[in-house]
């Protein structure tokens, strides 16, 4: 269910961009190439989501949840998850001095210095982190968040492969976003609706008392 939900939600964004003439199907790729890309992208999505879910929902959220309320643990882990995606990878310093560490940190955080490049992407990623934490809380396992996460990563990696830009968005770019897919308000809205659906679906499920990274709290 998680993988299907993740893939369908962002497939809806892609279909809307095609339907409104924002992007077009990239017919330059053969069907064999499309299939090959889909297999590779899905494999990469599963691998990345597995590692990130173990870290952010398994270790970070799980550790915080043992000490704090769900709200505090979810907000903290979701904020960290969103911020990390905007960290830059600075070049290695030519020489090391007493201030090298702070200089490297400033370069890493430079991706957060331009609000137009940060919003609404950071809100979308924060909403994703919050939903995945909720799924972890309600199921007591990482399988559902792992599936959702893999479905979203698949489209983040495939959006520009399956489609090509057709229109000059201009001021509409705030709504549709760029080729990254996650930086448009449409994607944020779809993730928000997806969150409401899963929160409602899991709302009546009994809250597990404990969970390990992939199973139940010890």
Predicted feature residues:
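Alpha-helical transmembrane segments of multipass membrane proteins
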Residues: 5, 9-13, 77, 81-88, ...
């Amino acid at each position: 269910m998680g993988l299907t939900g993740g893939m369908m939600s962002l497939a809806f964004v892609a279909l809307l961009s095609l339907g409104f003439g924002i992007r077009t199907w990239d017919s330059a790729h053969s069907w064999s190439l499309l299939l090959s890309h889909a297999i590779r992208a899905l494999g990469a999505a599963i691998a990345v989501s597995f590692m990130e879910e173990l870290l952010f929902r398994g270790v970070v959220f799980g550790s915080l949840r043992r000490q704090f309320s769900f709200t505090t643990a979810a907000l903290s882990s979701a904020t960290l998850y969103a911020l990390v995606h905007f960290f830059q990878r600075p070049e290695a310093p030519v020489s090391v001095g007493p201030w090298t560490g702070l200089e490297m940190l400033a370069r890493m955080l430079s991706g957060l210095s331009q609000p137009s490049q940060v919003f609404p992407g950071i809100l979308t990623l924060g909403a994703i982190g919050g939903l995945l934490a909720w799924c972890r809380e309600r199921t007591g396992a990482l399988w559902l968040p792992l599936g959702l996460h893999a479905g979203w990563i698949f489209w983040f990696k495939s959006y520009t492969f399956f489609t090509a830009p057709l229109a000059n968005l201009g001021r509409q770019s705030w709504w549709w976003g760029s080729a990254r897919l996650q930086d448009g308000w449409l994607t944020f809205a779809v993730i928000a609706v997806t969150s409401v659906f899963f929160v409602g679906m899991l709302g009546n499920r009994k809250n597990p008392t404990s969970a390990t990274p992939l199973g139940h709290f010890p």
